UniProtKB/Swiss-Prot annotation:
Oxidoreductase is among the record's keywords: yes
Domain of life: Bacteria
Protein name per Swiss-Prot or TrEMBL: tRNA uridine(34) hydroxylase
Top enzyme class: oxidoreductase
Species per Swiss-Prot/TrEMBL record: Listeria welshimeri serovar 6b (strain ATCC 35897 / DSM 20650 / CCUG 15529 / CIP 8149 / NCTC 11857 / SLCC 5334 / V8)
Length: 319
């Protein structure tokens, strides 16, 4: 049995003074020796925390004693250690950012909830568009079979992508999904205000679908990206597959790294061998960038040799 747990949760509810709440909540979390990342806004709370089983259970009881969060659902993962290095509770304008001119309140408008078994039926329906509401790098390491991959790098780009592809989605049944459900609460509501009529969402997100005793994560390919030190977690308990592809050679891969150029920091899938071969950098420009954190540890001679090994030249050698 694991000694630690990771809790994923959110709740759209009114918080009158997010800044004061954040300070008090941070103090409470630290007292319970939790680590994690929590966003607080006037519209609610969105968090992931890790801690010992005893500490996380205490936290869930603590939240249940607050009427605003008494019915909040926690997605619970067993873990061998903390999933975060520190504890942060930050006040924000939104708990998920769509950055709309007119914000959407999921308590007033949101898509129809589909439970995991209903969502599985939708996955098998050829007349339904399954729309991934996550970022491109989240999709690339794992997604539902047949889902549409929006070409976006952050959530606030999604409405623009929808408008650009409106003709392909018009008059279609749309079912959207995300990690734990919070993004879809707001996004599905926006879809309805934007004129799409038949809009549904996976209730509780991928995390809930993967733990459901009937679906057991079936029809999910790859792993689910998570925003903590675990990076990705398994979902499909029936017939797991690998869909991630190494950025450099296209071979199956589920290992994410960040480009060593801090001005880039792009997340790419790469094996240990290719990380070393390509100097943990996504491009030649990033490899030769003076701020590159990987190449700073190399001597000039070794840097030149490593570049030549992949048929590249250092700037100093260019005439």
């Amino acid at each position: 049995m694991s000694d630690y747990q990771v809790l994923l949760y959110y709740k759209y509810t009114t918080i009158d003074d997010p800044e004061t709440f954040a300070k008090e909540h941070l103090a409470a979390c630290k007292e319970m020796e939790l680590k994690g990342r929590i966003l607080v806004a006037s519209e609610g709370i969105n968090g992931t925390v890790s801690g010992t089983v005893e500490a996380t259970n205490k936290y869930m009881d603590y939240m249940a004693n607050d009427a605003r969060f008494a019915d909040m659902v926690f997605k619970i993962d067993a873990a061998d250690s903390h999933a975060f290095k520190k504890m942060h509770v930050r006040p924000r304008a939104e708990i998920v950012s769509l950055s709309l001119e007119e914000d959407v309140n999921p308590l007033e408008v949101t898509g129809t909830y589909l439970e995991p078994t209903e969502f599985r039926e939708a996955l098998l329906d050829e007349d339904t568009v399954i729309l991934d509401a996550r970022n491109d790098y989240e999709f690339d390491i794992g997604h539902f079979r047949g889902a549409v991959r929006p070409d976006i790098q952050n959530f606030r780009e999604l409405p623009g992508w929808i408008e650009e592809n409106r003709d392909q989605l018009a008059d279609k049944k749309i079912v959207t999904y995300c990690t734990g459900g919070i993004r879809c609460e707001k996004f599905s509501g926006w879809l309805k205000t934007a004129g799409f009529e038949d809009v549904s969402q996976l209730h509780g997100g991928i995390a809930t679908y993967g733990k459901n005793e009937e679906t057991k994560g079936e029809l999910w390919d790859g792993q689910m990206y998570v925003f903590d030190e675990r990076i990705a977690v398994p979902i499909n308990q029936v017939n797991p597959t690998i869909v991630g592809k190494d950025y450099f050679d296209g071979t199956p891969c589920e290992r994410y790294i960040n480009c060593a150029n801090p001005y880039c920091n792009k997340q790419i899938l790469a094996s240990i061998e290719n990380e070393e071969k390509y100097l943990r950098s996504c491009s030649h420009e990033c490899r030769v960038h003076p701020a590159n954190l990987y190449t700073k540890e190399l001597s000039k001679e070794e840097f030149t040799e490593r570049l030549q090994a992949i048929s590249e030249t250092s700037p100093e050698m260019v005439q």
